[in-house]
Design a protein with these regions (language model features):
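Eukaryotic scaffold repeat domains enriched in small/polar residues
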Residues: 22-335
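Bacterial N-terminal signal peptides
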Residues: 10-20
Length: 335
């Protein structure tokens, strides 16, 4: 009887292990290879890709380019916010602004965030400077309706600060998360990038959070859907990240963490969200349920470590500095 019981336990253990391995293996649904590179020759210094309501594309490459504007057929039209012909620095790079993020509003005005100068500059479609807002430690920028602009910061008491048309603060929301007893660690781990949708909602993607998370907010700042990567295949990386937090907790040196969530984008039609974790691409429905997981590659078969992601109805535009921006067929729209 004991022998039969032992065999049964062993059989069940093997069955459970097989099921577990099957679940983990099933998480990677496919390997996606880009169809082609777009917006050539931009690549080095790539920071952001945006699609305006006017049909134009806006590609931020820094520090030497500025915001390059392309038409619907991906032909370059002009450059906005290009650095002035300044004296190169000792490293041989052009002087001038260092754009880290950008966005475009319904009127075609472009907002460029400069982390070095602590400025968010609004530029007209012809490149004329309309206004500049001084922001302490800006990280990401998003244009909102009615002339408002949202900025995420590294040093603020809230995650998001919204400025009105006059440049004054009109509201703040989002509380930094508690990961550590050290305030500087909590601030860094709460750092995030911004995105929007046509309904005026704002999305906050935590760059360094152990469990990758993009949180949806309405325009007033009330939290909505959480798009969070959890599960068996997310556990090892999250566990390693939390161990690193504990390790740095006891150090007296400035904290440093490797980015986990590197890009995200929202489907303007459905509200579904796509999230990039370096070479891994995750797809969520509008309710925050994870649908699929992919590995992404260039047409030449090189790993694509995404730092920009733009979702369109029939394709994904995914970019990496310095490789450039690539066109992917949407796997959920394959016929």
């Amino acid at each position: 009887m004991r022998r039969n019981t032992g065999k049964l336990v062993a059989f069940l253990a093997v069955l459970c292990l097989a099921g577990l391995l099957g679940v983990v293996a099933a998480q990677i649904d496919d390997q996606l290879t880009a169809r082609r590179r777009v917006f050539k020759p931009l690549g080095p210094g790539l920071r952001a890709v945006r699609h305006g309501q006017n049909g134009k594309y806006y590609v931020l490459a820094t520090p030497s380019v500025g915001v390059a504007v392309f038409d619907e057929k991906e032909k370059q039209l002009t450059v906005i916010g290009a650095p002035a012909a300044a004296v190169p620095d000792k490293a041989g790079r052009p002087g001038g602004a260092f754009g880290e993020d950008c966005d475009v509003d319904a009127q075609g005005n472009v907002y460029v965030l400069d982390r070095v100068e602590n400025l968010v500059s609004e530029l007209a479609p012809d490149g004329k400077l309309l206004r500049s807002i001084h922001v302490n430690g800006p990280v990401s920028v998003a244009a909102l309706p009615e002339g408002e602009v949202a900025v995420s910061t590294l040093r603020g008491s809230h995650l998001v600060t919204v400025y009105g048309p006059t440049g004054k603060v009109v509201r703040e929301f989002g509380e930094p998360e508690e990961f550590s007893s050290r305030q500087e660690i909590n601030q860094l781990l709460s750092e995030g990038r911004l995105g929007t949708d046509p309904q005026g909602r704002l999305y906050y993607g935590y760059t360094f959070r152990p469990e990758p998370l993009v949180r949806q907010y309405d325009r007033a700042g009330y939290a909505g859907v959480d798009f969070e990567f959890t599960g068996l295949d997310a556990f090892p990386e999250a566990q390693a990240a939390r161990k690193e937090i504990i390790k740095q907790e006891n150090k007296r040196t400035p904290p440093y963490f490797v980015a986990i969530l590197t890009a995200f984008g929202v489907d303007p039609a459905t509200g579904e969200l796509w999230m990039a974790l370096h070479n891994t691409l995750l797809h969520f429905d509008k309710e925050g349920n994870r649908l699929s997981e992919y590995q992404i590659y260039t047409p030449d078969g090189a790993r694509l470590e995404a730092n920009t992601l733009l979702v369109e109805p029939e394709r994904l535009l995914i970019g990496e500095d310095p490789l450039g921006v690539f066109d992917f067929e949407r796997p959920d729209k394959k016929h």
